[in-house]
Design a protein with these regions (language model features):
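Cytosolic covalent-transfer regions centered on His/Cys nucleophiles
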Residues: 1-160
Length: 160
């Protein structure tokens, strides 16, 4: 399964460049709330429920994996498939990443509690996709959520 099958153009947001993204300062909790809203809309789950599961996981250990990337994730009993959202913060933000650097790309995933193996494969796919610095830089420079989504589609097509 491709990551772009878990996303939609409506769940990719570039902060400060998309009209839906607030230009004010962004805290870690604010970012989780934005991602939860995007995921909740797609999955048909209340935003607060998604935000709580992402925040609970984040409280265990930061999902900031380094190189400007964070992958907030969690599981919900009432889901029957995985959903993903991408928040791009071009100026970077503090996220308590393991390498101590700012995070620019926040790729969130929620899925069913019973699908642990599938969930782990998705997290690994995201990590592999974002390993390439040139590709990360392209995403960070994207002018809109649609442009970023199109980059993801092209990158996954090239890797097939």
């Amino acid at each position: 399964m491709r990551l772009t099958e878990l996303l939609s153009v409506n769940r990719v947001l570039v902060r400060g460049r998309d009209s839906r993204a607030s230009p004010s300062s962004l805290s870690k909790r604010d970012a989780i709330d934005v991602l939860a809203e995007l995921l909740g809309e797609g999955a048909g789950v209340p935003r607060d429920e998604v935000a709580d599961v992402l925040a609970e996981r984040e409280a265990l250990q930061s999902t900031g994996i380094g190189d400007g990337v964070a992958i907030p994730h969690g599981a919900l009993a009432n889901l029957d498939k995985q959903w993903a959202a991408l928040l791009i913060v071009p100026e970077g933000m503090e996220f308590e990443a393991i390498d101590g650097t700012k995070v620019y790309l926040l790729f969130a995933v929620v899925g069913p509690k019973r699908a642990t193996g599938e969930h782990l494969k998705t997290l690994a796919r995201i990590s592999r996709l974002l390993r390439n610095k040139a590709f990360r830089d392209q995403l960070i420079s994207a002018e809109s959520g649609k442009a970023a989504y199109d980059l993801l589609v092209a990158e996954e097509t090239d890797r097939q």
